[in-house]
Amino acid sequence: MELKNMGDLIINGVGASNGGKFQLVTLNGHGTVNSDIECSDFECNGSGTVKGDVKANTAKISGNASFKGTIDSQQVTVEGTAKIEKNLYAKHLYVSGKASVGGKVKSEEINLHGILAVGEDCEAEIFKGKYRFTIGGLLNADQVDVELYGECKAKEIGGQTITVKQHKGSFIGTLFKPFFKTQLETDFIEGDIIELENTIAKVVRGNQVKIGPNCHIGVVEYTEEFSQDKNAVVGESKKV
Amino acid sequence: MSEELISKKDLLDLAGISYGQLYRWKRKDLIPEEWFIRKSTFTGQETFFPKEKILERIDKIQTMKENLSLDALADMFSPNISDLQMEKDDLIKRNIVSAAVMNFYLENDKSGLTFHFPRILEVYVLEKLLQSGEINLDEGKMVLQVLKDNAPLIKQKSCELVIFRKLGVSSCLLLINTEAVHFESGTKLVVSLSLMTCMEEIKSKLL
């Protein structure tokens, strides 16, 4: 795709555009794009709305952006609030603000330091989740690395290495602890190497399973190794 | 056409693969979403697969992944039509179509000697059916017409081509995402051909 010779679309203040192909798209202030855009770099600093799909090399959302379509970009950074009604495809996804996706997320590497809400499945090679996430479908990643700061939910989790750790809380954290549940809630966890803390799950299946403190697990099925912390509740564990 | 199902656990045992591999293949779209069948069991929800299809697919993946990257494999299994173009002579040289069938096809289709994927599929289906002797040339024309009329559908969905005869009169139809077909007893089912499988066969011949 040749975007080198395309013009830029810059909206400062209140403005609207009908979309198209651009080199650089910047929405500062209150910008609206009424249909699909294809560009090299997309940036939204104010409150922007795109009523179509976005195809870009890099997309950076620092303000408040809402997308009625799908985002397809190599690099997506969300530092503000992004609401995507359909799917999000990104090679690298970095969220330090809040991102909500109505459809599914497909990525190679997801780095989460904020809040991520996904309606359907979330797929990545590497998923690093800090703080909070809610996934309506399956969280499928080769490496799932979760550090719990708040309440996290996923319908199912599957992958090769799955690690869930409780964040070592600060002093203020312990003061407010009764108000926040720091736990991961899920129906299924399936993987080769599983290490859990503060997790509530109905079924955990894996080769090497290590259940840490504050877990409530219905059934653990393992093939090689199994260990359980004394502060964990496991309904049943069987070697298969 | 109700299929035997296999649970995820049994599948992993039987195929000797790990959860990690299964989920990786799923991510790469090597295993289609429709094959993940959720059913509730006494332990909660379990995932099942159509046994024959999944074992065949896993076997294919395992034998081919030594030579090809997972992404290349994904392209091969995906029903999306590649933007591939080939010349008439190439197709004959690569044993996708015999010269006789190619001539028959070109008599009925005058849109040139360059073949894009939908046309390769058409000619390949004809080749398969005519060479096996299951249909005659007139029926070949009929099949061709069905395939041409429904080309946009074939691109996206998993289609099945069904040819049947009754009292010597033949007809054919295209099924899209169907579970089963039943005929009345006087009807003879000549052939039922999955176009998805045909596409995979073509792709594996091209690679």
Predicted features, each with a name:
Chain A
Residues 1-240:
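Extended beta-solenoid/beta-helix repeat architectures
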